[in-house]
């Protein structure tokens, strides 16, 4: 592991952490989730489905499925269907990323204040983080949906920093997806916050763009 980068990241007094693909090695399940759900409904999914819904919240994805694929179910029921396909993985098998865990533990030892900001389900997120032993290190687990925002704009990170009274110029935002890194960089440009990007199996095609946007980058898969 890059011990120098771990030390640098852990030196930030405030940290905002994405979960899937950043803390947890879970993106392999999300990549196929939408397609798996449609197949379960007897619908052939389009090839570009994963990239289409990547930046959406669960609620937005469910509404999209209603509109585009004629799923005649309420949004909460569609979301429940999504989650039923991956809940067991969160509760039993999805591991933490070693590099992320090392930063989190060292940052906690340094007295850093940290939160999670995810587009995933809050309860499943907490269960998974508890199982891998990382939940106690975070002040709170926030979801973009509960904040009434998404990760396509830097505004959500600015809102979190304001809500938790994080000093922006001393805050590190940890993300993996291109759209989220771009939004985090936007927040950084506005506030002075820095961005650490994590490489993942789901972002390899965008990695050069991600590296160009982030202040720091963790290269290993």
Predicted stretch roles:
Residues 1-13, 105-108, 121-122, 126-221:
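Asp-based, Mg2+/Mn2+-dependent phosphohydrolase catalytic module
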Residues 5-102, 106, 110:
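N-terminal helical cap/lid subdomain that shapes the substrate entry/recognition surface
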Residues 23, 96, 114, 149, ...:
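Conserved SAM-binding loop
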Residues 25, 116-118, 197:
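Hydrophobic residues in well-ordered beta-strands that form the structural core
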Residues 35-37, 50, 78, 98, ...:
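Sparse recognition of residues in long alpha-helices and their boundaries
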Residues 44, 113, 190, 194:
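Residue-level detector of anion-binding/catalytic polar loops
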Residues 76, 94, 119, 150-151:
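Non-catalytic, surface-exposed connector residues within folded enzymatic/regulatory domains
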